[in-house]
Each structure stands twice: as structure tokens, then as C-alpha cells.
UniProtKB/Swiss-Prot annotation:
One of its GO terms (biological process) is mitochondrial translation. Part of the 50S ribosomal subunit. Keywords: Chloroplast, Plastid, Ribonucleoprotein, Ribosomal protein. Coiled coil: none annotated. This is Large ribosomal subunit protein uL16c. Pfam families: Ribosomal_L16. It is found in: Plastid, Chloroplast. Belongs to the universal ribosomal protein uL16 family. It comes from the Eukaryota. The gene is rpl16. One of its GO terms (molecular function) is structural constituent of ribosome.
Length: 137
């Protein structure tokens, strides 16, 4: 599972996701990309499950880039605990994703294989996604 080695703060505010992604919204490493169409938090477990699905389908013949990183903590209280006494313990890590963010990139495989791999990978994610092809400059 992905998580930062160290952070400035242990616990974060939830914040809110407004607008579209202005950075990380173009395919820059691979030839094909998986783009988010909705705002959401994507957990490190979901990222790992998606990565495994893509690598298994491509039989490890593809180069894969994970363009998001879970750098925000989500806290949870113990079950049946009373209110008060501070914020709960860190439960898991999430990546904040806005619409337009490129989640994964892939290269060194045919377009049909990449499309099928990303289609399978999309089932592991809690958001709608879109397959995109790199625009050559």
C-alpha cells in the first residue's frame, strides 16, 4: 500500500474538491491514460488493486505509471466510543482526485490491450473514468 514516509501533519481536515484539475491532466509519460471524470478520494487500497489488475492483464509487458499518490490521512473513531476526546486515529490514506486528473498511464502495449486493461481497472475505482490517448506535440 502506498503512503508517505513522513508528513508535515499527522491528521488533516477533510477539505473540499472544487473545480477541475489544472495540473496532472495530460498524458505525459505513457501513450495511453486513464482519466477521472468525477471528484473523489481514492484510497491506497483502491490504487493497489487497480495496479494489480492492469499488470496482471498486460502480463507485466507494459510500462505503468501511477500518477496519483495518497498523501492525505482519513481518521476514524473506535466503534461505540463517545463523542469528544479529540480526533480519531489515522485509519487509511487517500489521494484527492478532481475531474480531469490522469490516474494511470501505460505504454509498450497495443491500444486494444491498454483499453481492455483500463476497462477492467475502472471497476476497481469508485468513479467514472475515460480512456485517453496521448496528443503528440
Amino acid at each position: 500500500m502506498l503512503s508517505p514516509k513522513r508528513t508535515k501533519y499527522r491528521k488533516y481536515h477533510r477539505g473540499r474538491m472544487r473545480g477541475k484539475a489544472t495540473r496532472g491532466n495530460e498524458v505525459s509519460f505513457g501513450k495511453y491514460g486513464l482519466q477521472a471524470l468525477e471528484p473523489s478520494w481514492i484510497t491506497s487500497r483502491q490504487i493497489e488493486a487497480t495496479r494489480r489488475t492492469i499488470t496482471r492483464y498486460t502480463k507485466r509487458g507494459a510500462s505503468l505509471w501511477i500518477r496519483i499518490f495518497p498523501d492525505k490521512t482519513v481518521t476514524a473513531r473506535a466503534a461505540e466510543s463517545r463523542m469528544g476526546s479529540g480526533k480519531g486515529a489515522v485509519d487509511y490514506w487517500v489521494a484527492t482526485v478532481k475531474p480531469g486528473t490522469i490516474l494511470f498511464e501505460i505504454s509498450a502495449v497495443p491500444e486494444e490491450v491498454a483499453r481492455a486493461a483500463f476497462n477492467l481497472a475502472a471497476y476497481k475505482l469508485p468513479i467514472k473514468t475515460k480512456f485517453i490517448i496521448r496528443k503528440d506535440i
